[in-house]
Swiss-Prot record:
Name listed for the protein in its UniProt record: 4-hydroxy-tetrahydrodipicolinate synthase
Annotated organism of origin: Dehalococcoides mccartyi (strain ATCC BAA-2100 / JCM 16839 / KCTC 5957 / BAV1)
Disulfide cross-links: none
Subunit structure comment from the entry: Homotetramer; dimer of dimers.
Cell location: Cytoplasm
Length: 297
């Protein structure tokens, strides 16, 4: 679904000092991201600490961000779960709230078969009118969704695309070659954005775009318009920053970077911990080489 945008930011969830969700800051951050290159936002995905945000908090975040954003950008709700019934109920709630689409992660921990994955996503998609984006991230879920399963799911009309974070470029090429023409493939890894564009993907669901959204947008736009040398130069320039943002588990580095730059997003909920000094020093050093696109207010 091309209208969801080429550059989508997987937003962090801001917390107050007491650990509660800071909905006002989430709204402010959402608008800042749209002002710095993002076409849309994933709310309460991996970067938004979905495992430790309650359903009630999720729904309130969906509503708060959508209220702030309005028609300025697309709001994609992270509604996935490793229980099909819970994911279905969460998706239906997000639909009632009025989000633009949902992101459904491959079920984690319980290790379903490929047929189980197919039936999981099919069951949810057929129960909602929302556009559904699949999310393959085996580094976190253990289970890898095979290309054949994605291709099969792409025949369901409101399964509109996939966030592909496996890093398996051969599998991704197979997906792009065999899905229906309007099925959209986004990179789920910032470092894979340009290589995947070269293979025919559409864009990226990004973490680094919290900081350098305009530059990532320039890279994508340049590639699409045929200025591949400029796109490649941006990719090479951003690579050290991207590497520093994944030196430990996401969203630890990006939350540290935002707080360090003056964008108050608070800490993390256990079992995630804040960046240690070695990690923090590496991120601070990396940031010195970059212009930050996000408005700092």
């Amino acid at each position: 679904m091309k209208e969801l945008g080429r550059l989508i930011t997987a937003m962090v969830t801001p917390f107050k000092k007491d650990g509660t969700v800071d909905y006002a800051q989430a709204q402010k951050l959402a608008l800042g991201l749209l002002d710095s290159g993002s076409d849309g936002l994933v709310v309460v995905g991996t970067t938004g600490e979905s495992p430790t945000v309650t359903w009630e908090e999720e729904h309130a975040l969906f509503a708060a961000v959508k209220s702030a954003v309005g028609n300025r950008g697309k709001v994609i709700a992270g509604t996935g779960a490793n229980s099909t019934q819970e994911a279905l109920e969460n998706t239906l709630k997000a639909e009632k709230i009025g989000v633009d689409a949902c992101l459904l992660v491959v079920p984690y921990y319980n290790k379903p078969t490929q047929e189980g994955l197919y039936l999981h996503f099919k069951t949810i998609a057929e129960a909602t009118k929302l556009p559904c984006i699949l999310y393959n991230v085996p580094s976190r879920t253990i289970t890898h969704m095979n290309p054949e399963t994605v291709i099969r799911l792409s025949q369901i009309p409101n399964i509109v695309g996939i966030k592909e974070a496996s890093g398996k470029l051969d599998d991704i090429a197979q997906i792009i070659n065999n899905v229906r023409p309007d099925f959209t493939v986004w990179s789920g890894n910032d470092s894979d954005t340009l290589p995947m564009l070269a293979m025919g993907s559409y864009g990226v669901i990004s973490v680094a775009s919290h900081l350098v959204g305009n530059q990532i947008k320039d890279m994508i736009t340049s590639f699409v318009s045929g200025n591949t040398e400029h796109a490649a130069a941006i990719h090479r320039h951003l690579t050290p920053l991207i590497r520093s943002l994944f030196v430990v588990s996401n969203p630890i580095p990006i939350k540290y970077a935002l707080n360090y730059l003056g964008v108050e997003v608070g800490g993390l909920r256990l079992p995630m911990t804040e960046a240690d000094e070695k990690t923090a020093a590496l991120i601070r050093e990396s940031l010195k080489g970059y212009t930050i696109d996000l408005p700092i207010k």
